[in-house]
UniProtKB/Swiss-Prot annotation:
It comes from Mesostigma viride (Green alga). It is a single-pass membrane protein. InterPro entries: Bact_Transpept/Beta-Lactamase, Beta-lactam/transpept-like, PBP_dimer, PBP_dimer_sf, PCN-bd_Tpept. The keyword Chloroplast applies. Keywords: Carboxypeptidase, Cell shape, Chloroplast, Hydrolase, Membrane, Peptidoglycan synthesis, Plastid, Protease, Transmembrane, Transmembrane helix. GO terms for molecular function: penicillin binding; serine-type D-Ala-D-Ala carboxypeptidase activity. PANTHER family: PEPTIDOGLYCAN D,D-TRANSPEPTIDASE (PTHR30627), PEPTIDOGLYCAN D,D-TRANSPEPTIDASE FTSI (PTHR30627:SF1). Its EC number is 3.4.16.4. This is Peptidoglycan D,D-transpeptidase FtsI homolog.
Length: 598
């Protein structure tokens, strides 16, 4: 009896042990699954029961100031052949495709024979070609659709707009600097799916079909861009130059109306061009402006009361500063004679582009005062000109100790050597002369506009901010008084009418401008005796400035190249186009004029 009780009790204990052991294991497993692996299992279940839907979002269109598209998204097709699945002979297939793809029949046949599948016979084919192939319904031919950025004006706007790579990411120009504003973010929508992977009931969510019709509108005027490109392309061809650029600026707002370089590149096929073409050098590369900086120096001397409007200076033809002899227009012959020009008033100094006269004028300013004025203009090693482009524009100037310790530094700076800046910076300084003495910030992006051409956002540090004012705040600094700039503008008109800028004279129209010819630095140090930069800066019309036009030509190679006979004709051609495009009437009676170049 006792044995039976003990045996029964043992069985009860065993059952309880097994029960508690099983319960413990079950609770442990539940704890492991619910607590330790809970997040992982939840995500796994979510991934099995839902799907994240998104669609490709195109880049916003870039257009000029009049809404003309300059960069748009289109569809393109990669065309693949799979001979393994052909129902016809390779010869027949090649005959059907050759005329559409503009490829040789024999070439296509060889491709089909060498491989059995996955042959790319066309890359980024346009939609009209794809439609022709689809219409033929050829088995074994596959079309893979993908977005493509299309630039309808090719080289014309490449330096401004830039290009995108195969991943649709901006690599240069505004495509790069405005990447975040141009590339729309694709919305992610979570939707439930069944066991077969099909959407449950609701179908495709409406959020995926939201469209953005906004356009990134520039200040560029396509008509002026065309005229500028044709003029500079013809200009560098005639003088056999390395490269050239043209900038047209609104002197009151800072809006860039045209910016071109030649030679340029086609952003549709950017990979066919040398990489140095992708650099927007008018905004990045430094050069010594030469005589085009003389009007700026004249304004400094007038504003600082160092000279007066009716002052005269003696131009002895050459002047020695320390160990250096400075002459007038001495770029090709070191033995250039010191021709005496007698006494010149300040207008004659500018009109004749007298280096010696400019040295005498700036000698009336103490070097440290002169240096401070140059810094006021936004020039210096640590001063940057911010633009809408990817890289900042900067300048180069000797440090104040070197500038004030050596007389030669202020002397060569008086005629535009010894300091360096970008073409866009020089255009900004001429805008300052044009608008009454204000330094304004050049810009090229106007804002985001809708299909009714109404501005919605203004660009703020290359990102569109809905909270800031739609009216662009002009960033300007007062440097010169209107009375000073008025005197300089009159002098610039005389340069065109009866001076070195006479190649830009147009009967009936009042134009102001200045030629420039500067030596480039030699690799071994000092200045080159062979390589120069020529330039021409113009203000039109001079009595009511609306346009600042700058042309710079790098390394012209015709005999006796100067700004007057290389860059001058480029600017003249652009002004003629401006008159035609904008229907600008003459402002003075027609005058006869005899051209000459200095």
């Amino acid at each position: 009896m006792n044995k039976k009780k003990i045996f029964g009790f043992s069985r009860i204990v065993l059952v309880w042990i097994l029960f508690f052991s099983g319960s413990s294991l079950l609770l442990g497993r539940l704890f492991y699954l619910q607590v330790m692996k809970g997040s992982w299992l939840t995500n796994k279940a979510k991934n099995q029961q839902t799907i994240i839907l998104n669609t490709f979002q195109p880049r916003r269109t870039i257009c000029d100031r009049n809404g003309i598209p300059l960069a748009i998204d289109t569809l393109a097709y990669d065309i693949f052949a799979h001979p393994l699945h052909f129902k016809k002979s390779t010869f027949d297939i090649a005959n059907e495709l050759y005329s559409i793809l503009n490829l040789d029949v024999e070439y296509l046949q060889n491709l089909f024979i060498k491989n059995t599948t996955g042959i790319c016979i066309a890359h980024q084919a346009p939609e009209q070609i794809a439609n022709q192939i689809i219409a033929k319904n050829i088995e074994g031919i596959e079309l893979v659709q993908h977005p493509k950025r299309y630039y309808p004006y090719k080289q014309l706007c490449a330096d401004v707009i830039g290009y995108v790579n195969t991943l649709h990411e901006g690599q240069a120009g505004l495509e790069l600097s405005c990447q975040e504003s141009l590339q729309l973010q694709s919305p992610e929508v979570v939707s439930a799916i069944d066991g077969r992977g099909f959407l449950i009931n609701d179908g495709i969510p409406r959020e995926l079909f939201k469209q953005d019709s906004l356009c990134l509108q520039l200040t560029i005027d396509l008509d002026l861009q065309k005229a500028s490109y044709l003029a500079i392309y013809d200009g560098i061809k005639k003088c056999n130059a390395k490269r050239g650029t043209v900038i047209i600026l609104d002197p009151y707002t800072g809006a860039i109306l045209a910016l071109v370089t030649a030679p340029s590149y086609d952003p549709n096929v950017y990979y066919d061009f040398p990489i140095e073409r992708f650099k927007n050098w008018p905004v990045i590369d430094l050069y010594e402006p030469g005589s085009t900086f003389k009007p700026i120096n004249m304004a400094i001397a007038l504003e600082a009361k160092a000279i007066k409007k009716n002052d005269f200076f003696y131009d002895e033809g050459c002047i020695q500063i320390s160990d250096t002899i400075i002459t007038n227009n001495n770029y090709y012959n070191k033995q250039f004679a010191c021709d005496k020009n007698s006494h010149l008033n300040i207008t004659d100094v500018l009109s004749n582009s007298s280096n010696v006269g400019m040295v005498h004028i700036l000698q009336r300013l103490a070097p440290e005062i002169y240096y401070q004025w140059i810094q006021k203009l936004g020039l210096g090693n640590n001063v940057f000109l911010e633009t809408d482009f990817p890289l900042s524009s900067y300048s180069s100037l000797k440090n104040i100790l070197e500038f004030t310790s050596y007389n030669i530094e202020s002397a060569v700076t008086s005629f535009g050597q010894g300091l360096a800046m970008t073409p866009i910076k020089l255009a900004q300084l001429y805008a300052c002369l044009s608008n009454g003495g204000n330094i304004i910030r050049p810009y090229i992006v106007d804002g985001l506009f809708d299909i009714q051409n109404e501005k919605l956002f203004t660009l703020n540090n290359n990102i569109f901010d809905q909270n800031i004012s739609l009216k662009r705040k002009l960033l300007k600094t007062k440097v010169f008084s209107p009375s000073t700039t008025e005197i300089v503008l009159d002098m610039l008109e005389e340069v065109i009418f009866n001076g070195t800028g006479s190649s830009c004279f147009l009967p009936g129209y009042r134009i102001g401008g200045k030629t420039g010819t500067s030596q480039k630095h030699a690799e071994q140090g000092g200045y080159s005796t062979k390589h120069i930069l020529t330039s021409f800066a113009a203000i039109f019309p001079i009595n009511n400035p609306q346009y600042v036009i700058l042309s710079v030509i790098d390394e012209p190679s015709i005999p006796l190249s100067f700004g007057s006979n290389t860059a001058g004709p480029v600017v003249r051609s652009i002004i003629e186009s401006l008159i035609r495009i904008k229907k600008i009437p003459p402002s003075i009676p027609t005058l006869t004029h005899h051209y000459y170049c200095k």
